[in-house]
Curated annotation (Swiss-Prot):
CDD domains: HATPase_UhpB-NarQ-NarX-like. Keywords: ATP-binding, Kinase, Nucleotide-binding, Phosphoprotein, Transferase, Two-component regulatory system. This is Sensor histidine kinase YhcY. PANTHER family: NITRATE/NITRITE SENSOR PROTEIN NARX-RELATED (PTHR24421), SENSOR HISTIDINE KINASE YHCY (PTHR24421:SF40). The modification Phosphohistidine is found at residue 191. It is an enzyme of class 2 (transferase). The gene is yhcY.
């Protein structure tokens, strides 16, 4: 067996082992891409995951030149390019040499960032049977052509990646489905048991008050009734959060409805129209719910301001109240498990999370979420 063939088999074996161990798509693609570049002595690479409508996400990248990594990789996250256009038109079915890279061309026109000698790249579709997931692009300084053997190796790796993406997506779907079923079950049990018991306590207290003229006893009964009413409201909010529904009429309506449920007036504003995936919308929804709960419990105000601003590449969500606020210093860490949970949820979705607050000035919570690039935008 030739040395070249042995090296190819070794590369495929290493890639396959990494993919077989992967459970998170982004983390696995990041690791595999770096391994591929190391094993093939290529310089730079990136992977686009592409939806049926042509929108795409920069799912992984490794060792991008400064020209492409500037400003949070903006040139990689927006607009069309030759390889994406060809993929979306159905003209890219196997590994191919791309004559030049439109994104590099755009970077060179800026005349201020280094492309590290990269002008061309090979592009390979990521597929599994009839399912098409995206593109694998690899490049090296001064390399304008990839020979047939190199392209065959890239095709083999791309097929492995496509198969792994399909497996991980299926596993992710099954896990989410199981989680939603469990949340629904818990919500139903809480509604049928604890919720009904709290309602009974409230009614019993109301009836008991009519049976006595003792003012002290009446005050105690009033306290029990008010406490049970508060607990009932908390339980309704918890059930709402557990159930997977709530977004049927959109994020804005869900936020307003939830505010009304817990007794908060919501001033909602929106600029732009972000294209959110189901996962991104669900993440924003859960973070807003937790933030509004905190506002209701701790801020001492009956109004919260929620704004959603969208640009081509990002969506920014701000939740503001002018209530009590709290002493917060970023270097000291987050002050509560609820806020830590919001931060973890946001960062898991690839978003940035930060909070501003001071005693007597209220609280502002912000999330900045990268969006999928839309088909047809300019590079």
């Amino acid at each position: 067996m030739s040395k070249t063939r042995m090296e190819k088999l070794k590369t495929l074996k290493t890639i396959a082992e990494t993919l077989n161990q992967g459970h998170d798509i982004k983390a696995t693609l990041d690791e595999v891409l770096k391994e591929l570049l190391s094993l093939t002595n290529l310089q730079s690479g990136w992977i686009f995951l592409i939806e049926e409508d042509g929108s795409y996400t920069l799912a992984a990248d490794a060792y991008l030149p400064p020209a492409l990594s500037r400003k949070e990789k903006v040139l990689m996250c927006e607009g069309e390019c030759y390889c994406l256009t060809k993929f979306n038109n159905g003209g890219l079915r196997k590994a191919a040499n791309i004559m030049n890279c439109k994104r590099i061309e755009s970077a060179e026109n800026l005349h201020c960032f280094d492309t590290e000698g990269i002008t061309h790249h090979a592009t390979v579709p990521l597929e599994d049977g009839d399912r098409r997931f995206g593109l694998l692009n690899v490049a090296a300084a001064g390399k304008t052509m990839f020979d047939e053997e190199e392209l065959h190796l890239l095709e083999s790796v791309a097929f492995q990646i496509g198969t792994a993406i399909q497996r991980m997506r299926l596993s992710e779907y099954q896990q989410k489905n199981a989680l939603l079923m469990e949340r629904n079950r818990l919500a139903q049990e809480l509604h049928d048991s604890v919720n009904q018991m709290l309602f009974s306590v409230s009614l019993t207290a109301k009836a008991a008050k009519t049976l006595t003229k003792d003012e002290n006893l009446q005050q105690m009964i009033d306290f029990i009734q008010n406490l049970s009413q508060d607990a009932l409201a908390e339980m309704k909010a918890l059930i709402w959060q557990l159930r997977p529904g709530g977004l049927e009429k959109g994020l804005a309506e869900a936020i307003k409805s939830y505010g009304a449920l817990i007794g908060l007036k919501i001033i909602f504003t929106q600029k732009g129209c972000p294209v959110l995936t189901d996962e991104q919308e669900h993440m924003l929804w859960r973070v807003v719910q937790e933030a509004l709960n905190n506002c209701k419990k701790h801020a001492g105000t009956d109004t919260a301001y929620v704004s959603l601003t969208a640009s081509l590449c990002h969506a920014e969500l701000d939740i503001i109240d002018h209530g009590a606020g709290f002493r917060y210093e970023a270097h000291a860490g987050l002050p509560s498990l609820g806020i830590k949970g919001m931060k973890e949820r946001a960062e898991k979705a690839g978003a940035k999370f930060w909070i501003e607050s001071a005693l007597g000035t209220g609280t502002k919570l912000s999330i900045r979420l990268p969006l999928k690039s839309r088909k047809g935008g300019a590079v």
